UniProtKB/Swiss-Prot annotation:
GO terms for molecular function: structural constituent of ribosome. GO terms for cellular component: ribonucleoprotein complex; ribosome. Residues 1-29 have a biased composition (Basic residues). This is Large ribosomal subunit protein bL34. The keyword Ribosomal protein applies. PANTHER family: LARGE RIBOSOMAL SUBUNIT PROTEIN BL34M, MITOCHONDRIAL RIBOSOMAL PROTEIN 34 FAMILY MEMBER. The lineage of its organism: Bacteria, Bacillati, Actinomycetota, Actinomycetes, Pseudonocardiales. It holds the Pfam family Ribosomal_L34. The keyword Iron does not apply. InterPro entries: Ribosomal_bL34, Ribosomal_bL34_CS. NCBIfam families: rpmH_bact. It comes from Saccharopolyspora erythraea (strain ATCC 11635 / DSM 40517 / JCM 4748 / NBRC 13426 / NCIMB 8594 / NRRL 2338). Belongs to the bacterial ribosomal protein bL34 family. The gene is rpmH. Residues 1-30 are annotated as: Disordered.
Length: 47
């Protein structure tokens, strides 16, 4: 029996749309996430 295809099919546009900076900035919670990552000194804030 085959397992089927892999579920992760990379796509940069979809990645940015779902987890990107602009999306994070839309909501208060998203802005809090970015602020937390800035505070922690993350090299990459969002996808």
């Amino acid at each position: 029996m085959s397992k089927g295809k892999r579920t992760f099919q990379p796509n940069n546009r979809r990645r940015a749309r779902k987890h990107g900076f602009r999306l994070r900035m839309r909501t208060r919670a998203g802005r809090a996430i970015v602020a937390g990552r800035r505070r922690r000194g993350r090299a990459s804030l969002t996808a």
